[in-house]
Design a protein with these regions (language model features):
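N-terminal interaction/assembly modules
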Residues: 1-49, 78, 99-104
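Helix-turn-helix DNA-binding module
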Residues: 64-82
Length: 104
């Protein structure tokens, strides 16, 4: 089995972020589980704490219809940033959502 640097909370947070991106209005949360609501609030809070440009970057990368690795590579030039910088933003966002959600 190959080794990976993937954090244990990454898949959970990615699921929460995708749910948030498809349910951008809190009024659409009626009937969803308490866990879905907590996930939504965690993502909303983490995004609101970021600079506007980083919020746009996260939304663009997550919303791309391709694996995150490919989206980061593609959008680095568009945002005039290095891939390393984009990964720093994405990983920081993921970690912040995990903290807000109580996963770490």
């Amino acid at each position: 089995m190959p080794m990976t640097n993937k954090k244990f909370y990454t898949d959970y947070v990615n699921h929460a972020v995708r749910f948030y991106m498809t349910t951008p209005d809190s009024l659409q949360l009626a009937g969803h589980s308490p866990a879905d609501l907590a996930n939504w609030v965690s993502v909303q809070t983490a995004l609101s704490e970021m600079p506007q440009e980083d919020q746009e970057l996260v939304r663009t990368v997550v919303g791309a219809n391709e694996p995150t690795e490919m989206a980061v590579r593609r959008f680095a030039d568009r945002y005039d940033r290095t891939m390393s910088d984009l990964w720093t933003v994405m990983n920081g966002f993921t970690k912040r959502v995990a903290v807000l959600r109580g996963l770490i």
